[in-house]
């Protein structure tokens, strides 16, 4: 198979050194794995998330990022609580599906996919609905690439004392933030996003006091984040059920490479430059971005089809043959395709992509 760059929002292109770390087998009960790898990366994750490391902890959970979203909703929302979900895309809507499955009392505020979650609307809703106890939203909604106003939304949620759940699947590690300063109670992300690991597990950065309140609440055995956390705490990195050892080791290497790059701020700068090179190049070819620049994230970029009758499959195949894999669109109101800016990819890769697009008959 011809190698190619994954210009997708995860799974994504990983470094050779991340791949190479998966060539070794690890014993799940040995301290070489649990103490020196799992416990170490749990602490590193908290250190990336906040300077207030004593107040927060991390839980790792097998499966995709959605497993972690479901685990948090299923354990943090008690039977007497009410969840407000603010959605402007498929992943916010998925939170509603999870709440529906668990028969959780919830309300979903739906916003247009090309508009940010409205801070004023959420503020007004909370002022008139005091029964809401928890609020959840997606930071970077990869349905379109829109970036929701995290700081402003967190402020209006925390002012009346509500608990805050943030799906930072496609932003944590790639966009600077401090969960303590923002007042986030549960932040959710995944190994195969901005940290640049491979798929296989997700993680939750949780306020310790709120995680303790999850004891006995979970609606699922395998997704019980309190039980998972307690086992990891007492067992010094031990997982309740078989852990994805190779994926975890690759993630540890990816964390090392994040630090070597200069941390989240440096990675954010690279992603922003990737996005800039991509957008300027595509616009020079006549392509139009779906979103206004002011609300666009540097994570993934949506482009409108350039003309009626545009054959995305043929376009995709042509780019793949030249070493680039992109993403189809995910919204119903417009025909789009998406190009991810994250992973072990650099501005020169996007300059090369633009030249390939220029040479492609579309």
Curated annotation (Swiss-Prot):
Pfam families, from UniProt? Aminotran_5
Q: Please, which domain of life does this record's source organism belong to?
A: Bacteria
Disulfide bonding pattern of the chain: none
Necessary cofactors: pyridoxal 5'-phosphate
The free-text function statement in the UniProt record for this protein reads: Involved in phosphonate degradation.
Q: Which GO terms describe its biological process?
A: organic phosphonate catabolic process
Official protein name in the record: 2-aminoethylphosphonate--pyruvate transaminase
Q: Which family does it belong to?
A: Belongs to the class-V pyridoxal-phosphate-dependent aminotransferase family. PhnW subfamily.
- This enzyme's EC code(s): 2.6.1.37
Keyword Glycosyltransferase part of the UniProt annotation? no
Which keywords label this protein?
Answer: Aminotransferase, Pyridoxal phosphate, Pyruvate, Transferase
- Which NCBIfam families would you find in this protein's record? PhnW-AepZ (TIGR03301), PRK13479.1 (NF010006), transamin_PhnW (TIGR02326)
**Top enzyme class of this protein?**
transferase
Assembly mode:
Homodimer.
Query: For this UniProt entry, which residues form the secretion signal?
Result: none
The answer to whether the entry has keyword Secreted is no
Q: To which species is this protein native?
A: Bacteroides fragilis (strain ATCC 25285 / DSM 2151 / CCUG 4856 / JCM 11019 / LMG 10263 / NCTC 9343 / Onslow / VPI 2553 / EN-2)
**HAMAP family annotated for this entry?**
PhnW_aminotrans_5 (MF_01376)
Please name the Gene3D superfamilies in this protein's record: Aspartate Aminotransferase, domain 1, Type I PLP-dependent aspartate aminotransferase-like (Major domain)
One molecular function GO term is: 2-aminoethylphosphonate-pyruvate transaminase activity
Q: Which sequence positions carry the modification called N6-(pyridoxal phosphate)lysine? A: 193
Q: Which reaction does it catalyse?
A: (2-aminoethyl)phosphonate + pyruvate = phosphonoacetaldehyde + L-alanine
């Amino acid at each position: 198979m011809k190698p190619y760059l994954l210009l997708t929002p995860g799974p994504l292109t990983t470094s050779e050194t991340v791949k190479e770390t998966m060539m070794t087998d690890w014993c799940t009960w040995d301290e070489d794995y649990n103490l020196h790898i799992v416990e170490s990366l749990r602490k590193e994750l908290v250190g990336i998330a906040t300077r207030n490391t004593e107040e927060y902890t991390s839980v790792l959970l097998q499966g995709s990022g959605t497993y972690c979203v479901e685990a948090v909703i299923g354990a943090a929302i008690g039977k007497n609580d009410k969840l407000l979900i603010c959605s402007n895309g498929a992943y916010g809507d998925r939170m509603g599906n999870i709440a529906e499955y668990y028969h959780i009392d919830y309300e979903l505020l739906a916003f247009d996919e090309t508009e940010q979650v409205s801070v004023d609307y959420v503020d007004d809703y909370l002022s008139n609905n005091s029964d809401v106890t928890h609020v959840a939203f997606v930071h970077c909604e990869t349905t379109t690439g829109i970036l929701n106003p995290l700081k402003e939304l967190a402020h209006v949620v925390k002012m009346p004392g509500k608990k805050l759940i943030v799906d930072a699947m496609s932003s944590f590690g790639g966009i600077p933030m401090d969960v303590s300063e923002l007042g986030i109670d549960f932040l959710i992300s995944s190994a195969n996003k901005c940290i640049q690991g491979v798929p296989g597990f997700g993680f939750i950065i949780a306020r310790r006091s709120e995680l303790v309140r999850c004891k006995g609440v979970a609606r699922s055995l395998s997704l019980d984040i309190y039980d998972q956390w307690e086992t990891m705490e007492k067992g010094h990195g031990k997982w309740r059920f078989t852990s994805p050892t190779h994926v975890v080791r690759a993630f540890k290497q990816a964390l090392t490479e994040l630090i070597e790059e200069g941390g989240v701020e440096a990675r954010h700068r690279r992603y922003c430059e990737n996005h800039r090179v991509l957008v300027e190049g595509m616009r020079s070819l006549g392509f139009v971005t779906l979103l206004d620049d002011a609300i666009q994230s540097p994570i993934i970029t949506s482009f409108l089809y350039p003309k009626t009758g545009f054959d995305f499959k043929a376009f995709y195949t042509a780019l793949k043959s030249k070493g680039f894999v992109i993403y189809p669109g995910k919204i119903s109101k417009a025909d789009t395709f998406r190009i991810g800016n994250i992973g072990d990819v650099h501005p020169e890769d996007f300059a090369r992509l633009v030249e390939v697009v220029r040479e492609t008959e579309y």
